């Protein structure tokens, strides 16, 4: 049995040697030879350079991206600075307009009042301490006409600028428009709780009360204060 096994091993060795000789005769390296291992090693090393070239390529890509981002940041910074400057200019113009509105907001009203002042000045010129007694009647007539003209002009100016006079006789008492001075007994035809007498007219500007009318309000006799 041992002889048979030895003979089989010898046969296999002979076949392997014959196969190796035939492989080398054709110039092919043996699969397990040193040359084959060296060639395989070189092939493996030949794949290493891309790994060595990898970092520089990635670094260049990052640099390009960084430059691009830096330009974008600079562009955004310039835009932001311009926007801030525009906002500041708008704020200054708005503030200037508000200040001008405060100063010149009543310019038109004052211009119309100047005409009233002219009428008043001409009316006072009609009065003279040295006027003769026979001229006093004529002077009073001129003053009266001047005062009527002055009143008409004032009403026209007030209406033009939305200023409305409040004379609320007979109206129901409203604390938002009337200032109560006292209560008076309700007379004939006068309803309790209504304005019986106006001591001082009130005024509204474009529907907003700027001065309350000073009034006396009617009440029933037993509730008189």
Swiss-Prot record:
Its main location: mitochondrion. The keyword Transit peptide applies. GO terms for molecular function: adenyl-nucleotide exchange factor activity; protein homodimerization activity; protein-folding chaperone binding; unfolded protein binding. Gene3D superfamilies: 3.90.20.20, Head domain of nucleotide exchange factor GrpE. GO terms for biological process: protein folding; protein import into mitochondrial matrix. Residues 1-32 form a transit peptide. Keywords: Acetylation, Chaperone, Mitochondrion, Transit peptide. It is found in: Mitochondrion matrix. Pfam families: GrpE. The modification N6-acetyllysine is found at residue 142. SUPFAM superfamilies: Coiled-coil domain of nucleotide exchange factor GrpE, Head domain of nucleotide exchange factor GrpE. GO terms for cellular component: PAM complex, Tim23 associated import motor. Probable component of the PAM complex at least composed of a mitochondrial HSP70 protein, GRPEL1 or GRPEL2, TIMM44, TIMM16/PAM16 and TIMM14/DNAJC19. Belongs to the GrpE family. Essential component of the PAM complex, a complex required for the translocation of transit peptide-containing proteins from the inner membrane into the mitochondrial matrix in an ATP-dependent manner. Seems to control the nucleotide-dependent binding of mitochondrial HSP70 to substrate proteins. Stimulates ATPase activity of mt-HSP70. May also serve to modulate the interconversion of oligomeric (inactive) and monomeric (active) forms of mt-HSP70. PANTHER family: GRPE PROTEIN (PTHR21237), GRPE PROTEIN HOMOLOG 2, MITOCHONDRIAL (PTHR21237:SF10). This is GrpE protein homolog 2, mitochondrial. It comes from Pongo abelii.
